[in-house]
Regions:
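Karyopherin-beta/Importin-beta family HEAT-repeat alpha-solenoid scaffold
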Residues: 4-7, 169-171, 184
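Non-heme Fe(II)/2-oxoglutarate
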Residues: 1-82, 100, 203-208
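A short hydrophobic beta-strand segment most commonly corresponding to one strand
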Residues: 112-114, 176-191
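Catalytic core of non-heme Fe(II) oxygenases with the double-stranded beta-helix
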Residues: 93-161, 191-198
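Short beta-strand His + acidic residue motifs that chelate non-heme Fe in jelly-roll/DSBH
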Residues: 101-104, 168-174
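A short coil-to-beta-strand element that immediately follows conserved catalytic motifs
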Residues: 79-90, 125-126
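Extracellular and organelle-lumenal recognition/adhesion modules and their flexible linkers in secreted
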Residues: 168, 177-179, 193-197
């Protein structure tokens, strides 16, 4: 009997792109002005609406486009002109050598993203959700089917979009500094069944100002 085919189903999707340009001097100067206005953890800015500042309007547009690309490529809505991903919160992270970010998720958010402002060589690690399995098998080699942690290499200008309930972390930083801009988002518009025999089921209109 031939060996059975392994078929991955219900994959978790992340997208990664590069904004394709350097950060302008005035953008960098403005973002660096927040490095001394961080929370007690010494990393996250107190301002959690950083992308609402007019000085970062172009950067916000790039982040918004990446969210819309994810929405259309992954969710593929039947009503693309009546639904979008709306950025709800955004903040800067200033990290130094030997610091790290614990494993965490983002609550009250559908998709979140990280734009790397200053990260010559960095990594974001995604962790598989706990399936409730109560056993451990040492694998001969790691594959997409048995990996528990997936590191993704990133650098300055990279923009990563992923589901907000996906556990992620940042390993110990080996460079002098790491600056990133993180943001949350939520559906804005109409969701649920829009057309067909199920029309109206779970229909919801969301209006985020």
């Amino acid at each position: 009997m031939k060996q059975g085919q392994v078929i991955p189903i219900f994959p978790t999707t992340i997208t990664i792109t590069n904004i394709g340009r350097d950060f302008e001097q005035d953008e960098m100067s403005y973002m660096m002005s927040f490095k001394d206005h961080v929370r007690d953890n010494g990393s996250n800015t107190k301002d959690i609406y950083i992308l609402e500042q007019p000085e970062l309007a172009d950067i916000k547009a790039l982040c918004h486009k990446a969210l819309q690309d994810y929405l259309r490529q992954v969710y593929n809505p039947i009503n693309p002109d009546h639904i979008e991903m709306k950025i709800t919160h955004s903040w800067l992270n200033f990290s130094r050598r030997e610091q790290f970010h614990y494993k965490h998720t983002h609550h009250n958010s559908i998709l979140c993203g990280v734009l790397y402002i200053d990260a010559a060589k960095d990594t974001i690690v995604f962790t598989k959700a706990d399936s409730g399995d109560n056993w451990q098998i040492q694998s001969k080699e790691e594959t997409p089917f048995n990996m528990h942690d997936v590191p993704i290499s990133v650098s300055t200008g990279d923009l990563v979009i992923f589901p907000s309930n996906l556990t992620h972390s940042v390993p110990t930083i080996k460079t002098e500094r790491r600056i990133s801009l993180a943001f949350n988002s939520f559906f804005n518009g109409t969701i649920g069944f829009i057309e067909g025999p199920m029309k109206g089921i779970n229909y919801l209109k969301i209006n985020i100002p």
